[in-house]
Amino acid sequence: MDDASKDYLESLPELHSGETFCFDCNPEVPCFNQCCAELTLPLTPYDVLRLRRHMDNIASETFLANFTTMRSFPDTGFPLPMLRMLQGPGEPCPFVTPAGCSVYENRPGACRFYPLGRGTKMGKHGIEERFFLVQEPHCHGFDKGTERTAEQWLHNEELSEYNAANDRYMRLMALVRATGKPLEPRMATMAVLCLFQLDKFRELISQMHIFAHVDVPAARQTSIMADSLDGDKAALDFALDWMELIIFGQSSQLSKK
């Protein structure tokens, strides 16, 4: 998360553990779909993984070229693909339709969180999180909403896998941030391939015989190379380990042979 995003979250009312809010979003709400336009929406590796699978496993190169604008985190140099809005009136999200989200089952984590914001930081005992309530002037979802806690909202929106994958990515970036130096361009390019282009990463694994150089159980190797949603999850998990290893020469989860 960049400084501007942190400042924005800090300006919002915090929703403490056990506190409730009332919100619903559906076609009956007058503002339905209005929040799905003119977005500044960064995509995480797990977001891209899920969206590509929804789109019949479209090639990663095609997905990134057609749907994103690639930027980078200034403090770490890690890639930061932004979902590209359509040109034209209102600049709508490329996945929104009059009936709602066309990728709803695999929509990005930020969309699932709304109207909550999640702030995280590395604490002594792991990831520490705080939740904030985003109340925009155009939104009528709060008018007659269902009462819930932040924890209930996360459960209903099936955010556990998103958070787990995104927190792993955040930990890797935190390690790089602690060095005070962003990734070199060559390593940043490798991060795009390994984290956002899992199809290309599998090709790299085969071409470079990576499994011959690191200690990966046979069952995990099979999972990583499987062309499936679960295989993609395993590949991303390994990619995060691999990036840590090649950046720092060691990894807490992966060792050289």
Model regions and ranges:
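Short loop/turn segments that flank or connect secondary-structure elements
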Residues: 1-34, 40-49, 53-54, 58-61, ...
